[in-house]
Every structure is written in structure tokens, then in C-alpha cells.
Amino acid sequence: MKKWLMVQGTTSDAGKSVLVAGLCRVLARRGIQVCPFKPQNMALNSAVTPDGGEIGRAQAVQAQACGIAPSVHMNPVLLKPNSDTGAQVILQGRALSNMEANAYHDYKKVAMDTVMDSFQRLQQEYEAIMIEGAGSPAEINLRENDIANMGFAEKADVPVIIVADIDRGGVFAHLYGTLALLSESEQARVKGFVINRFRGDIGLLQSGLDWLEQKTGKPVIGVLPYLHGFDLEAEDAIAAQQNLSADRQLRVAVPVFTRISNHTDFDPLRLNPNIDFRYVGQGESLSGADLIILPGSKSTRADLAYLRSQGWDKEILRHLRLGGKVMGICGGFQMLGEWVHDPLGIEGEAGSSEGLGLFAMQTELTAEKRLTNVKGHLTLDGQTVAAQGYEIHAGHSSWAADQKSPIILSDGSLDGLVSDCNQGFGTYLHGIFDRPETALRICQWAGAKEIEAYDHRAAQERAIDRIADAIEQHLDLTLLWPDL
């Protein structure tokens, strides 16, 4: 029997992504061929598929939970915001164009055809598809032409469960109100509710569960407990959990840009118990770090201006004068050069922005985006380790032949730079910290001589298994699939 199920939420960050990942692992454990699917994702955290397409990182993690490679059809529409009112539209892994919100609202009727094409392809290949909604299905202003929630569920004729985060408070109002704002046909599609992140005695919640079931006629499929210390890649929001301690081997600071992209790059550092890691927000100081890392950006020139508005440029230069280390990834790497040129207005108004000048490097943004998974070797301080990652960038950086590139890729090409003073290191590779030995080598270069390696992939697997175990224990899955 085919198993299609869509997980929608009462709010953003209700637990949809994690619940889908857990359900994928539960079904995969039973030998069921399962895959994830999200019709439309709005996120600056993206992944590269084996065939060179771009999808949301959440779907890549969910594919990992299934034990399969990610595909562009698992997230056929990806929106990458590049301003408060606009985004780059990516269809089936390929960039289409930049659109303002009003233009995209009209375009969604066309995008639905792409969504259905991808979904139907997956239906032919898999026994089960776990589908993730976006935000809330009860956003009245977004109901017209909806492709992310009930608009898709109705078109594809799939059942829905609604999840809410009780840790935020107001869970019964969220669930009851969300259901009430749906049409009759949409309400009929809802098979039940899941309450997420509950702390305390479940007996004290029972009267509320009984009331909800009586008022709505829908079952509460289960109540998932609050999993202390649980951490699985955030879909887009910066993770609140940070590693702050005075006795760590290395202190790392990452400034949060207005259009920061792929901040999941830093999860292997943020979760490493040997590292004091902090994100630095608006009005905060970078001081006190051993290593400052400039992250990726969807709008490099705009975020370079933002960096200067925060006074971080002066702090970075002072940090270098005092012997500290600075690293840049993708857009952050571009910022460390001399100039970033955007003659075509790829990221906004055409023009050029002066970089921080750590590298004698010029970057020109171009319409063509490079999307690829790569492997190679990284050499820092004369020691070489295996390295891998993925590139997602528009533009090309050039530098003099006598400058040192620390990364040699498997095709013989070079990536990144190390400054003459050995205090700066830049690379285009997202995910460079995912391999334990690579992260260890970079941390040692930054001054942490006795730091221990941290296996982020193994930690991800433990987190996926943990949520799957909680689902097995606390959800009545026979309410969804009697034959399971």
C-alpha cells in the first residue's frame, strides 16, 4: 500500500522538518522505500544534489534519514531571499530568475506544474513519500495559488497531519484555530494532530487532549517529548544553542549577516564540546575570538556594507594585528579580497565594493551559478588532509599565480587562498567542516593544538535515530497506516 503523508505545522519552527526526518527513518527501518518531499522551501541553507542541482538542506538531511541520495525532485521549488521583498527562484535545482514577491505570487500557478511533475516522478519510484509543508496552512493572505501547504495537498490528494510546538505555549489555540481556518475539504484531509516538545507529566495534559479531540473530531496521534540536547540542522533560522565556555580549546566567532547563507556549515564547530562557539549579531562585538569566520552570503556586497556598518571590519583588522586568524567561506571569502564587482546587477544595484584586502583577489559576480560537490586535499601549515564540500556561488575570483591555494581538488583545480602572513584562509567550499580530520586541521591552524576531532555525520545519525525512536514510542502510527 502506498503511503503518502503531509506534515503541516501551526507555525514556522513547529517541528515539521524534524518530524518528517524521523518518519522517514521509521519507515526506512522497516524496509520501505521512502523519500522526502517539500513542494516549496524558502531558505538560504541549501545543498547540492549528485547531479548538480540545488535544494533545501532540510530535504538533504531527510534523504539521509531515508538512506538515499538527495534529488532535485525532493524540493522542486526553492526560494532564496536576496532582499526583504525578493528572492531567487530555483526550479528543480536550477536558478530561474530573481522575482519580487508580487510577481512570484502570480507565477505560483506555473510553479505548481513543476511541483506536480516532481511529485509524480517520486510516486513512480517510491513506496512512501513524507511531505513537509511550509509555515502554516492557515495564512489567509497566502491561500490564493498556494503550492506549499493545502493547495498542494488538495491537488495531490494526500492526507495531512498538523504539528504544534507546545513549548511555545498556546498549543490548543494553535491547533484548534488552524483547523478552523481551513475549508471543509481541507479539514476532511486532516487525519490528526501531533504535539511536539512536551515537558513534564503527560497526565496533566490529558484533559486538554480530550477536549481537542472532542471539539475537532480529530485524534491526537501522539505527544513527542522535549528532547534535551537534541540538535538537527535548522532549516533556516540560526540555531539558538551555542557552545560558550571559558575553558575550551578554541574560541570561534561568526558574524551574522543580513543574508547569511548555509550557516549549517558551522554546526560541526558549534556542537563540538572542545570549541567555544558564538554567533555575533547586530550591535555585538567579535572581540575575544581566536578565529573569526565570515560566512556565506546571498548578497555579498550588501552584507559587506552591513559588516562595515557594524564596525566589524575594524575589529577584524585589529584581530589580525594581534595575531588572530580569519577565515572566509564562499561570500565571506569574496569579502576578504580587494574588490567585489557586480557589473550586471546580479545581487542588486550594479557596481563594485571594496573588500577587506586580506587577499590580493578580485571577484566578479556572474549570472552563471556554480553548483557541484567536490573532493580533494587541504594543506595548512605543511600538513595535508582529505577535504570535501560543495560549491554554490555565482561569480569567479582571480588572483596572482604566486599566491598559495591550500586546496587541490580531485580534478586538479585549485580552491581558496592562504594569506602570506598565514593568518587568513578562504575557500569556496561549503561543508568543509563536515569531515572530522578537515575540521581538526583548520582548528589546529587556528591555534587549538590539543583539540579532539568531532564526527558531525555520526552525531547527525544519532539525532535522526533519536527522533525516530521517540516517534516509535510516542506516536500511534496505526492511526495513519493500519497495516504498518
Curated annotation (Swiss-Prot):
UniProt pathway annotation: Cofactor biosynthesis; adenosylcobalamin biosynthesis
InterPro entries named among the record's database cross-references: Class_I_gatase-like (IPR029062), CobQ/CobB/MinD/ParA_Nub-bd_dom (IPR002586), CobQ_GATase1 (IPR033949), CobQ_N (IPR047045), CobQ_synth (IPR004459), GATase_3 (IPR011698), P-loop_NTPase (IPR027417)
One GO term of the biological process aspect: cobalamin biosynthetic process
Domain of life, per lineage: Bacteria
One function term, GO molecular function aspect: ABC-type vitamin B12 transporter activity
Keyword Mitochondrion: no
UniProt keyword annotation of Repressor present: no
Entry annotation: catalytic residues: 330 (nucleophile), 430
Cross-referenced PROSITE patterns: GATASE_COBBQ (PS51274)
Pfam families: CbiA, GATase_3
Coiled-coil residue spans: none
Domain GATase cobBQ-type: 249-438
Keyword set, alphabetical order: Cobalamin biosynthesis, Glutamine amidotransferase
Similarity-based family: Belongs to the CobB/CobQ family. CobQ subfamily.
HAMAP family (alphabetical): CobQ (MF_00028)
Role this protein plays: Catalyzes amidations at positions B, D, E, and G on adenosylcobyrinic A,C-diamide. NH(2) groups are provided by glutamine, and one molecule of ATP is hydrogenolyzed for each amidation.
NCBIfam families (UniProt xref): cobQ (TIGR00313), PRK00784.1 (NF001989)
UniProt protein name: Cobyric acid synthase
Organism (species): Vibrio cholerae serotype O1 (strain ATCC 39315 / El Tor Inaba N16961)
